[in-house]
């Protein structure tokens, strides 16, 4: 009888090509993390279609995104629309501040032609996007409701704005109309909607009016008061940018130790996806949901 080869954890049975016990454990942990990480489409599948358009969000749902991210701004006549910038100049064929324009003014603009111009630089024939008029949050909520599966929504309030707290007031009114301002189903079931902001004041307004809605504190840098992993009072989820995670990977552990979930934005490069998986983040917010899902073995 041939002797059974032995090896200690951390080694590999080279002759048989079998991974060691520690490698098996590492791979199992990595696989589990990949399956658990939520993939969030940043402004829709915005690498493939014009950001914040129905086309981008439809593509994200088709690609299998777990959640959709959007920015909301209030128009002059009180409608919440999905636009990132304060002004429409970059992403439409118009000009002016969203807060100074009425919905009818925005509806007359093309929010897809800039992407066509961008695509034409690398292709002889640019794509002909459909559904690229301004997108209201109401229409996006309808799309999610009709998705045929659970699709969560991460809504970012943009501040400062001339409308201040009216943004949160209108947002909660709209969520209430869709039955999304309070837990649905089992009492401990996670909410399908969360509200994000760089403004702690915005999140406090949401918490005061609708304490069951999860909130996310977004960060471009880590302020001294939050270096130990603390967040503004009552906020359960941290939203650091990928630059923070690259420069200070240990910060994720501090946030986790403080009991917070970690949702990282905007994660587009494969090496950054690997970094986030290794650190055990809870959500990856990306312009490329299909590519990230594929990298996580879920595509």
Short names for language-model regions:
Residues 3-299:
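Phosphate-group recognition and catalysis centered on beta-loop-alpha active-site segments
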